[in-house]
Amino acid sequence: MYNSAKQLQRVLTAREIRKTFLDHFTVNHGHKFVRSSPVVPFCDPTVAFVNAGMNQFKSVFLGTAAAPHKRVVNSQKCVRVGGKHNDLSVVGTDGYHHTFFEMLGNWSFGDYFKREACAMALELLRGPYNIDPGRLYVTYFAGDKVLGIPADLECFEIWRSLGFPASRILPFGCADNFWEMGATGPCGPCTEIHIDHRPDLGSVEQRAKLVNAGRSDLTELWNLVFIQYNRHADGSISQLPAHHVDTGMGFERLTAVLQNKSSNYDTDLFTPIFDGIQQAAKTPVYSGSFPDGGNAAVLDTSYRILADHARMVTACLADGMLPDQNQKLRRVLRKALNISEHVFAHDKLLTQLVPIVVETLGEAYPEMAAKQQAVIDLICHEQEVYKNLRESSSKAFAEVLMEFPNLDDIDLMECPGFVPAYRELQMQRCKFSNNTIPGDFLYKLTDTYGLTEESFLKLAELENMNCDLERYRAEVSLAKLKAKGNQRETAGGSLCDLATEQRIAEAQAMLTKRLTPTDNSHKYTYSFDKESDSYQIPPLKTRVLGMLLNDAEVSRTQGSRIQQPFTDLISIVTAGSNFYYESGGQQSDGGKILVSNHQQPDHPHSLDVIGVKHLNDCVVHICKLSSPTDAFQLAIGDEVELQVDAQQRQLNTCHHTATHLLNAAIRSLFKKVTYQVSSSVSSDQCKLELGLLGKRIQKTDVQLIEDLINRVICSAAPVEVQLLSAAEVLEQNDITMVPGEVYPEQGLRLVNVESPELQLSSKELCCGTHATNTSELSCFCIVNLKQTNRARFAFTAVAGQAAENVLKTAALLRHRVDLLEKQFQTDKLTNATEAELQTIRHNMLHTDIKLPYAFKMDTLERITEMLKRIKDSSRTTLKEFVDVEMRTLLQEKPLDTHPFILHYITSSALVEEIPLQRATKLCPDRPILVISVCDSVVKARCCVPEKCITEKFNASAWLQSFADTFNGQIAAPKGQNPQAVCNMKGRRVSNLFEEQLEQAMSKAHAYAKLYL
């Protein structure tokens, strides 16, 4: 049993213990309380979870950010499930490992140091916590001759002066008492306070030998780190100009000590959760037994695992982490679901534990209470995904899971090629170096198995491997190049081969490494002129810092050296720039650079800016001569004038603000768990892909979204921008952030649009350019909606002038369709009527014409109804079209080059009842899968000759790969072999079924290519 020897008059609750710690430092010692950062790393891409109290202050120690206060105290939420700190595998088997835990800590940033830190710690332990110092041991750094660092005798003397006898002050080496952030950077000695839970087992001398020996009855309680050195790349150590203190004490262990418990799980942090499990599942009460403790130990271990995982899942989901984007979280969540179902026979148990977790932790972390329903919704969604995955799993898939149990964490229904890709990775990984999947292999995964970049990144995470994304993207570019006959079009319409473009990119990177950074703050200097209804962007005069002519660095260039003025590229780096470079999903600006013309001073030379890059803190303007002239001259140090294309910037700006309003409107209207997957902003349109749980967006929803945004535009709400630090951002609760995004420590731009009367609030971190007032957007409309995943929707929208153009196009089309409908009503049909309807329908579906989405859907329904009426008079003739279409197809695709047929019968759109058997009978010599779509109903039939049937390739399996996209039901005709022939029952689809059809056929094609 943990025993502090001095029995407290009253056992403190966990809440009181946490509050006592925080009050000790804030009230008694002038510290500032800083709330816990989310467990999602905010400014640190090096870790998957916040796993220590110091994570949010790492940049302060590195010197890249200012300290929020000189003295800080907090209780930090931490998660450890992988990497160096991996507690997942042992959770539940002992009394002190957890995936989620709290770290109590106090910090000094250049203020107090060793003596004050030790004194404050001992004061708390001996005073408010009433721990007998006779149960405490302390350690100090013994020094390291190799590093040339002496023993921390100062620390030894401090503890002596605070009343510790020398027998309780123990020296240890680097492994135990020297802290380092990394291979280089801040580091320093530490002192640890250990507590003896069983002092009756031996003398001080005997027990002292057990410190740092891995004993459960003598454990570390508090670690005080003194950051006073800096390790350099050559391994040498030097003193830091300012010294810091970083301390950490595990809250769960401290609570067990103060509540006189032998296990962290016996404290009031966990017992309410155990009670909730027992009451819901009606299982035997938790008894606290551990492995080797009999039959009860198995159940008790499950109690501990489920309680721990419920805390971890609740904390992560409340902080905005998503299982779909973090496989470690999904693994823990699914393990908790499995235990709930298989051990406690209660499939809703995990969601019932969330309110209990919130009750135990919500006072310290109010975001948990605020997000409680969202957490429950996310768990329910993940449970449904997991359930569907298991239910739809074939025998073959079950065998795969037995072979590769790790794949249980992946939604394989979204990517049928994942399993064979995983198998190939297992075979090939021994050939890879540095635990990195090479770019050419990544490209093979996408090309052969249909994996997306997102899915192969999940694959790499599953195997704890890295990906050579740079080489992969080069392979993708090379494939595009080959497809276009070794030529591809670059920005601005010029042609250059990939090798040249790569050389230019490498030269740009080398050039910018040696130059001073560009002042790019001028890109935010612009205003809106109401009279002209346009943006005013003042030109910027600045000096040239560096220059390339194609891939060659030059100090001076002139017209005579530019052999091909419309294709030769000039890369110019300037001291300042008002051009926006592509970032935050927003495309870069276009415009011109004006260069002095010494022959005609009033007519400067002009360079077209066709691209803008940001490299090594420099802005690179990629230019071409606007017109060929030998008189053109430009040298480093020359003054130039940068002119941004204001019209393009205005469209980009309006579309970026529109993207924020769209995101906010969806969250406001539907009150569902919503998260951003991706966004892109251009002068043509904006795209926003969102995860939206528990809601299927319909045509009427689109109209609601548009209406709300247009009312916000009419309300002329101001768009405000605030500059914040990361610490200031974390103090706010209502900011929309992109899950998994890593933000800088300083200079974060918070874009805020508030329309209280319309109950819409948009607060997003964003580096893009934005309108100054919503009225500048003029109007807004959604032009496309696509469901990209089980719970993901991609919106395409336009605003401003682009939206006005779309509405004008819609008005013209509405007028024409109205006239055609009048012809139907008066029976004044001509032979050209059907042709015109088909042309309109084709243009709406297959061209780049933009129309309001709701209008487009309504119009397609009207056209479909008119075409249906036309078909009634020619049904028999049209059925013959099917035979003609199939015979033509088979002639064009002979057996020797096309071992299988996968075909959508286009003429099926004209005939209400096409017997697909009629089509498959025409192809008896090879596997065939044919699809028809008529009156918004999709059907399919598959036949496989007996000679082609295998366990993995047969009619049922092949058709299933197609049907999954539509959630279609398949079955063999009565009395027939499902491996030889199979039908998909008709499924209703929208008028915009082409995208779904393309996706389904792509999966079926990949399946046949892989297994036939």
Curated annotation (Swiss-Prot):
<keyword id="KW-0436">Ligase</keyword>
<keyword id="KW-0547">Nucleotide-binding</keyword>
<dbReference type="GO" id="GO:0006419">
    <property type="term" value="P:alanyl-tRNA aminoacylation"/>
</dbReference>
<keyword id="KW-0862">Zinc</keyword>
<dbReference type="InterPro" id="IPR012947">
    <property type="entry name" value="tRNA_SAD"/>
</dbReference>
<dbReference type="InterPro" id="IPR009000">
    <property type="entry name" value="Transl_B-barrel_sf"/>
</dbReference>
<dbReference type="InterPro" id="IPR018164">
    <property type="entry name" value="Ala-tRNA-synth_IIc_N"/>
</dbReference>
<keyword id="KW-0496">Mitochondrion</keyword>
<keyword id="KW-0648">Protein biosynthesis</keyword>
<dbReference type="InterPro" id="IPR018165">
    <property type="entry name" value="Ala-tRNA-synth_IIc_core"/>
</dbReference>
<dbReference type="InterPro" id="IPR002318">
    <property type="entry name" value="Ala-tRNA-lgiase_IIc"/>
</dbReference>
<dbReference type="GO" id="GO:0008270">
    <property type="term" value="F:zinc ion binding"/>
</dbReference>
<comment type="subunit">
    <text>Monomer.</text>
</comment>
<comment type="function">
    <text>Catalyzes the attachment of alanine to tRNA(Ala) in a two-step reaction: alanine is first activated by ATP to form Ala-AMP and then transferred to the acceptor end of tRNA(Ala). Also edits incorrectly charged tRNA(Ala) via its editing domain.</text>
</comment>
<dbReference type="InterPro" id="IPR018163">
    <property type="entry name" value="Thr/Ala-tRNA-synth_IIc_edit"/>
</dbReference>
<feature type="binding site">
    <location>
        <position position="656"/>
    </location>
    <ligand>
        <name>Zn(2+)</name>
    </ligand>
</feature>
<dbReference type="GO" id="GO:0000049">
    <property type="term" value="F:tRNA binding"/>
</dbReference>
<feature type="transit peptide" description="Mitochondrion">
    <location>
        <begin position="1"/>
        <end position="24"/>
    </location>
</feature>
<feature type="binding site">
    <location>
        <position position="660"/>
    </location>
    <ligand>
        <name>Zn(2+)</name>
    </ligand>
</feature>
<dbReference type="Pfam" id="PF01411">
    <property type="entry name" value="tRNA-synt_2c"/>
</dbReference>
<dbReference type="GO" id="GO:0005524">
    <property type="term" value="F:ATP binding"/>
</dbReference>
<dbReference type="InterPro" id="IPR045864">
    <property type="entry name" value="aa-tRNA-synth_II/BPL/LPL"/>
</dbReference>
<keyword id="KW-0809">Transit peptide</keyword>
<dbReference type="InterPro" id="IPR018162">
    <property type="entry name" value="Ala-tRNA-ligase_IIc_anticod-bd"/>
</dbReference>
<keyword id="KW-0694">RNA-binding</keyword>
<dbReference type="InterPro" id="IPR050058">
    <property type="entry name" value="Ala-tRNA_ligase"/>
</dbReference>
<keyword id="KW-0067">ATP-binding</keyword>
<feature type="binding site">
    <location>
        <position position="766"/>
    </location>
    <ligand>
        <name>Zn(2+)</name>
    </ligand>
</feature>
<comment type="similarity">
    <text>Belongs to the class-II aminoacyl-tRNA synthetase family.</text>
</comment>
<dbReference type="GO" id="GO:0004813">
    <property type="term" value="F:alanine-tRNA ligase activity"/>
</dbReference>
<feature type="binding site">
    <location>
        <position position="770"/>
    </location>
    <ligand>
        <name>Zn(2+)</name>
    </ligand>
</feature>
<dbReference type="InterPro" id="IPR023033">
    <property type="entry name" value="Ala_tRNA_ligase_euk/bac"/>
</dbReference>
<keyword id="KW-0479">Metal-binding</keyword>
<dbReference type="GO" id="GO:0005739">
    <property type="term" value="C:mitochondrion"/>
</dbReference>
<keyword id="KW-0030">Aminoacyl-tRNA synthetase</keyword>
<dbReference type="GO" id="GO:0002161">
    <property type="term" value="F:aminoacyl-tRNA deacylase activity"/>
</dbReference>
<protein>
    <recommendedName>
        <fullName>Alanine--tRNA ligase, mitochondrial</fullName>
        <ecNumber>6.1.1.7</ecNumber>
    </recommendedName>
</protein>
<keyword id="KW-0820">tRNA-binding</keyword>
